[in-house]
Amino acid sequence: MLQEKESIKQANEFAIERVFNAPRHLVWKAFAEAERLAQWWGPAGFKMEVKKLELSPGGTFHYSMQSSDGFIMWGKFVYLQIVEPEKIVFILSFSDENGAITRAPMSATWPLEVFNVLTFKEHDGKTTVTLKGHPVNATEEEIETFRNEFEGMNQGFSSTFDQLDEYLAKLLFDHS
């Protein structure tokens, strides 16, 4: 039964990995400090604002992203585990401006909560960031919606990681 549950979880798990040409401590700071996150988090073309960032178990990252046409989306992480500089475990949700969990603006059947694990591994001065996520407390319909959006999530996180790549390159250039 446990093995069956594990294989179901894996089938419903989104994963993306990126190697950044920067040391792990800098990549970690880009995820851990509000002023750094505001420089790169979210899709290209969106203006990011950090309302709150408390990187500790039970803490939150509450933010908004505004598109060029003025559309605003709110999101929230609730941190479950922080192992600096190796791992961040959190629940990701769409939210309103007060931090209350809401439905995704693009889908009425998107899961309300997505469990995520971010890992940071350094090798030869480069850092591999791996993100894995799966719905929690979700209906079958929400799980199916999540699974059907793997390609879109891959594009979205690739764009976000492109911005992180640019941010880190600028940071390293400015300090060289």
Model-derived regions: residue spans:
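Hydrophobic-ligand binding "helix-grip"
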Residues: K51-L55, H62, D69-D124
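Short beta-strand segments enriched in hydrophobic/aromatic residues
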Residues: F20, M65-S67, F94, G133-P135
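Beta-strand/loop substructures that line and gate deep hydrophobic ligand-binding cavities in soluble
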Residues: A100-Q155
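Short beta-edge strand/loop motif at the mouth of beta-sheet-based domains
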Residues: A15, E35-V78, H175-S176
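Hydrophobic ligand-binding cavity/cleft-lining segments
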Residues: M1-K47, Q163
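Hydrophobic pocket/interface hotspot
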Residues: V27, L37, F61, Y79, ...
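Short, highly charged C-terminal tails/helix-capping segments
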Residues: E166-S176
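Intrinsic-disorder/low-complexity, polar/charged segments enriched in Ser/Thr/Lys/Arg/Asp/Glu/Gln
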Residues: A11-E17, R24, T60, W74, ...
